[in-house]
Curated annotation (Swiss-Prot):
GO terms for cellular component: ribonucleoprotein complex; ribosome. It comes from Pasteurella multocida (strain Pm70). Its cofactor is Zn(2+). The lineage of its organism: Bacteria, Pseudomonadati, Pseudomonadota, Gammaproteobacteria, Pasteurellales. One of its GO terms (molecular function) is structural constituent of ribosome. This is Large ribosomal subunit protein bL31. The gene is rpmE.
Length: 70
């Protein structure tokens, strides 16, 4: 392996907006601020909501007189 061409791989701290702190290693070289993590992401916490866009699709089809595919 060539010497002096690889970036420094240092320990960094990733802090989430929920307050969770994750220690990891990275070539970024500075601490990271995260918006979401595994502790607060809706998919992992079970608070995920399904957005129903059926009404919008029907309104679009009605507006542009596209026959329904059902």
């Amino acid at each position: 392996m060539k010497q002096g061409i690889h970036p420094n791989y240092v320990e960094v701290t990733a802090t989430c907006s929920c307050g969770n702190v994750i220690k990891t290693r990275s070539t970024v070289g500075k601490d990271l601020n995260l918006d979401v993590c595994g502790n607060c992401h809706p998919f992992y916490t079970g608070k995920q909501r399904v957005v129903d866009t059926g009404g919008r699709v029907e309104r679009f089809n009605k507006r542009f007189s596209i026959p329904s595919t059902k």
